[in-house]
């Protein structure tokens, strides 16, 4: 699963997920899966969607993951009283803003790419849409 090899600090503030997305264009492949909604994707969700796509295209073509879970999320153990410090890091998330391209694909027909992205989108908690590369 995706997570940083090392970080400057173990834990992070919660923060807010506002603002506009960076990386809104399909730049590596021909087809892409773009976020319409705002939210956060865990490393497990990113991997589940990648596996669904890979199986759908039967390992042909190439898939790029354009997001990386670099924010640690902490949780306290069950039945522990409030206080006594911040909890332990349990999983990693990627913050997603509307317009962000999540995955890209190349080397497969458009119908197959649409089907693969549809299966991947079912694994994700945010609303997404299918996009193609625009040549200028």
Swiss-Prot record:
Keywords: Ribonucleoprotein, Ribosomal protein, RNA-binding, rRNA-binding, tRNA-binding
GO biological process terms, semicolon-separated: translation
Signal sequence bounds: none
S-S bridge residues: none
Keyword Cytoplasm among record annotations: no
Cellular component terms per the entry's GO annotation: cytosolic large ribosomal subunit
Top-level lineage group: Bacteria
GO molecular function: rRNA binding; structural constituent of ribosome; tRNA binding
Quaternary context: Part of the 50S ribosomal subunit.
Function: Binds 23S rRNA and is also seen to make contacts with the A and possibly P site tRNAs.
Homology family: Belongs to the universal ribosomal protein uL16 family.
Record-given protein name: Large ribosomal subunit protein uL16
């Amino acid at each position: 699963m995706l997570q940083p090899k090392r970080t400057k600090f173990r834990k992070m503030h919660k923060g807010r997920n506002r603002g506009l997305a960076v990386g809104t264009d399909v730049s590596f492949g021909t087809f892409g899966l773009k976020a319409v909604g705002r939210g956060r994707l865990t490393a497990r969700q990113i991997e589940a969607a990648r596996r669904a796509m890979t199986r759908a295209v039967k390992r042909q073509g190439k898939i790029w993951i354009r997001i990386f879970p670099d924010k640690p999320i902490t949780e306290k153990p069950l039945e522990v009283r409030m206080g006594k410090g911040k909890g332990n890091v349990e999983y990693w998330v990627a913050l997603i803003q509307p317009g962000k391209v999540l995955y890209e694909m190349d080397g497969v027909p458009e119908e197959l790419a649409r089907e693969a992205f549809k299966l991947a989108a079912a694994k994700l908690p945010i609303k997404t849409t299918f996009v193609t590369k625009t040549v200028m």
